[in-house]
Swiss-Prot record:
Belongs to the ABC transporter superfamily. Methionine importer (TC 3.A.1.24) family. It comes from Vibrio parahaemolyticus serotype O3:K6 (strain RIMD 2210633). It is found in: Cell inner membrane. GO terms for cellular component: Gram-negative-bacterium-type cell wall; plasma membrane. This is Methionine import ATP-binding protein MetN. Its EC number is 7.4.2.11.
Amino acid sequence: MIEIKNVNKVFYQGSKEILALKDINLHIAKGTIFGVIGSSGAGKSTLIRCVNMLEAPSSGSIIVDGVDLTTLSKKQLVETRRNIGMIFQHFNLLSSRTVFDNVALPLELAGKDKSQITTKVTELLKLVGLADKHESYPSNLSGGQKQRVAIARALASDPSVLLCDEATSALDPATTQSILELLKEINRKLNITILLITHEMEVVKSICHEVAIIGGGELVEKGTVGDIFAHPKTELAHEFIRSTLDLSIPEDYQARLQPNRVEGSYPLVRMEFTGATVDAPLMSQISRKYNIDVSILSSDLDYAGGVKFGMMVAELFGNEQDDSAAIEYLREHNVKVEVLGYVL
């Protein structure tokens, strides 16, 4: 279990004070895969580095398995960190050591005997799918294989918590998915708590049980993945959800798009559907109710946390009054509608 209580972090550039984290409060239950998402500079990397005290909070508490890390001596902190594994975007493997020896390093530093090390490393390499790579060197591995070695090394001391700092950002989509599947398997088999940070909502959608959204060093929104996708409360949450869907406006429409309605133009709208609104026949309802035609240019549908969500870009053909009434009807039925402009 991880508790982050009233955490603030201040950095200084000369005399300038930069508040990187502002009063962050999170509770991460044991065995959960918890995602923290934010854009570059949002403070998410600073937050995850505070969890194992690579960065000490300026104020607040970091409690892992009942122990407040901010109260520990350096010696106590070194011992406690063995219970917290961490992997990074860059794999940080030692190029002069084999795969086996890279994974063995934490065990050697902990003073384990040779037979214990051999048993543990063999078990971990099998877990991460590298049972045949004991004697390989990092230079002979793919990016995904290097990250698997890093994961095995992070698990060597049997931690209860695994921190993942943009662990898939340097990988291609197929390799990213395989690493996420491995993390899910590790979570399931070992009941290890995983805290990961990312700037990709696709990662959150694929693996996380709960998610927190951070912007400008502040906690913007948090909840189960299903709740966030079904009922996003902030514009930042909407932006991240939109990023998971492939929705584009044809170039010829973009060229004809006007900022204001003029004679002969019609509104182009983007609609976001979540939860029950996905299955509701709202397009046919507004077509009948307000005597308008709906031309769908693009749409996409996906699932996250057991919840369906979707987006649509469409042109509405009616008079100005009926178009406005139809848009208001959609909003009353919990559809987020944005008028992108008017097509001439």
